[in-house]
Amino acid sequence: MSQTNWEADKMLDVYIHDYLVKRDLKATAQAFQAEGKVSSDPVAIDAPGGFLFEWWSVFWDIFIARTNEKHSEVAASYIETQMIKAREQQLQQSQHPQVSQQQQQQQQQQIQMQQLLLQRAQQQQQQQQQQHHHHQQQQQQQQQQQQQQQQQQQQHQNQPPSQQQQQQSTPQHQQQPTPQQQPQRRDGSHLANGSANGLVGNNSEPVMRQNPGSGSSLASKAYEERVKMPTQRESLDEAAMKRFGDNVGQLLDPSHASILKSAAASGQPAGQVLHSTSGGMSPQVQTRNQQLPGSAVDIKSEINPVLTPRTAVPEGSLIGIPGSNQGSNNLTLKGWPLTGFDQLRSGLLQQQKPFMQSQSFHQLNMLTPQHQQQLMLAQQNLNSQSVSEENRRLKMLLNNRSMTLGKDGLGSSVGDVLPNVGSSLQPGGSLLPRGDTDMLLKLKMALLQQQQQNQQQGGGNPPQPQPQPQPLNQLALTNPQPQSSNHSIHQQEKLGGGGSITMDGSISNSFRGNEQVLKNQSGRKRKQPVSSSGPANSSGTANTAGPSPSSAPSTPSTHTPGDVISMPNLPHSGGSSKSMMMFGTEGTGTLTSPSNQLADMDRFVEDGSLDDNVESFLSQEDGDQRDAVTRCMDVSKGFTFTEVNSVRASTTKVTCCHFSSDGKMLASAGHDKKAVLWYTDTMKPKTTLEEHTAMITDIRFSPSQLRLATSSFDKTVRVWDADNKGYSLRTFMGHSSMVTSLDFHPIKDDLICSCDNDNEIRYWSINNGSCTRVYKGGSTQIRFQPRVGKYLAASSANLVNVLDVETQAIRHSLQGHANPINSVCWDPSGDFLASVSEDMVKVWTLGTGSEGECVHELSCNGNKFQSCVFHPAYPSLLVIGCYQSLELWNMSENKTMTLPAHEGLITSLAVSTATGLVASASHDKLVKLWK
């Protein structure tokens, strides 16, 4: 569905119908569809239990927790946080500025500069202290507060009482450091302002990764905290933040948690950014802020905190536990994107993963100038807002919010609050170069001052050390460490690009990449998960017949063509969610996967689930393997990899697929013993071929004729006419065991080859209907060399035999795999052969020169490999099928990127050189097209 063409009532009808179908209420669904004239188009957010169910369950969980505290610890924590916020607001109201604004601004600037230099050291010490010495931390906090009081009398006087309240009100949260100390201590459990490493490391990541659900609870908490006043946020303790992270998963089931999580994620970055004020905006915190805008789309009030200065943002910290989100891969819960979390985490990991930060920038770009202005205004008004409004914010998350950054970065109102910030974020232009940390610091200072002035003018709360939204740019800037600051800044630059977020039935995001910005010196590319639906392309590759583990459900969001990227589901959600990888002209890469419905609504912007894997897949500049999304040579320019269509191809597992030579048809088959031909443009079925008596293991089109052949565990090979569905043309029987693979010769139309479990290879003549040759050499998969057909690659156990087609002599025996080979594939030229085992991929040269030599090698990083295919347009890019995800390997740069794709094992891949499509078949019963 297009982003701009949708109506709320019609979309509701579509999802009600989808819910009825998912509940197997077929008669009711048909009646409702007929009477309500409901569209038959597939829903954009295809949640396993129905989008309405996942949406409703999240809110029900929070509602019931108000009457039954034991129902959900996460929900209870959420409610408790609201109470704490109310207390903090009272404290803030009682507090009065004692120092002039100018003095405060100067003090804040000085403190921030100091914090930039001291945050990391303090974070490390504080992390240890938090775990084992809460009392020591309190003492340190007091000392730091005294120092800060000297510099910022007002801020510190306000903060100690808030801290005391936090300690009293939240026994779990033992202490909250001063604005400086707080972010630092939170670094482990929350978002430490000090260093990205501190934030990422330790508690935050483990919490989120261990508990995808925790992401959702964190999101909800972060959202509330964002609404809180800056002082209020400070009052929250680190302990509370940690608890939120721990409990989030409990509060909501994976799908629900993902919904809350996405909502919280949007708000979280803002709080995190804000709380880093006195502590000095660390690139991590800044990155979070940038990310926040994307999440802010969900909740304007949440967005307000992003722009509003905040001394301490425990909630942000919670959210800031980006590690958690990323642990779950930005697509944390059922595909719900946790932009805030992932982005925060990316900020934390800036040094390690600058690209992560850039993702947050992309989110910011997605906001329109008007939305940005709204966010700024909301922040200004945030202080005056009542606590009761915070309770509504969660609902607001569900409301559609469209936010885009104007060329100036923020809307005009935003410009007022944060002038000059937008300029750094300009969509077309590059942000500040990596080295311009000084510039960023200056911008940051200016923004802080302006924000303070605006707040004072607006009346309401006294000025506080405000991490100030430091709109995307500033956020990135302040890390004492040149590298981190550079990365964050660079990412911020990448951020620069206008974008709009809209909410369709399935949230479709337009993510205008200023991926150009990503070009920035940092060289890190940010990847954003994107979900989309549409036609896809693929070419044949390996298939597997083994059972696949169950996968978690996920919901995809629609994706708009072009440079617009919609958020896909979180990896947790499952392979079902659609995902997309996009590389801007600058070579920046964005990868998105379908996000949960709520996340799609406003925060579809970014899952961050892909962030870890996608980080810099296409970045030539970074050698960091984490930057999996670095530029792939020419691939980096304008390269996109997006799911364009999906179809349930079977009632059981799908094991194989292949394109016709013209790319107009796609064939798939699997455990249901049937082969289905699909029109690739519409993915509508053309023909179903039913004659096999056991599961089909391989399916191949003839290169020159509209014929296709299938092999099966019934020990037969059958040849079919694509235009005649009545019966098979030939049935070849002769194998003594299950036939595992087959292939047509590229030139000799009459020749077909097959292999079986007994390592026997047979040549068949289609015209004569007889077996012409039998020899040993292959048992898993066989593939003829494209174009010339000189060689036949046959995998057997852990080696690949390259046989001469004419003499059947083994020309090369390619050894090097420790485990059995699952798949082999040739590049379109026939010069290179790839072999895949569960732990390794090897690429061999066979065209010219030193044949049989391994020229590229990739080891598994945790997700076992299963199938492979060379990209039809970029020969240096190998697409590898894994469990639930696709691995994109840029061999020339030795960079990899993971893209959530299915909810089961991806057994087969296929490519069409005619259309540029890539097809993936999976045990989740789906066949998807990518381009």
UniProtKB/Swiss-Prot annotation:
Highest taxon listed in the record's lineage: Eukaryota
Does Nucleus appear among the keywords? yes
| Annotated TM spans | none
Q: Which CDD domains match?
A: WD40
Signal peptide boundaries: none
Role of this protein:
Transcription repressor subunit of the SEU-LUG transcriptional corepressor of the C class floral homeotic gene AGAMOUS during the early stages of floral meristem development. Is part of the A class cadastral complex that define the boundaries between the A and C class homeotic genes expression and function. Interacts together with APETALA2 and SEUSS to repress AGAMOUS expression. Also plays a role in ovule and pollen development. Implicated in embryo and floral development.
What is the protein's given name?
A: Transcriptional corepressor LEUNIG
What organism does this protein naturally occur in?
Arabidopsis thaliana
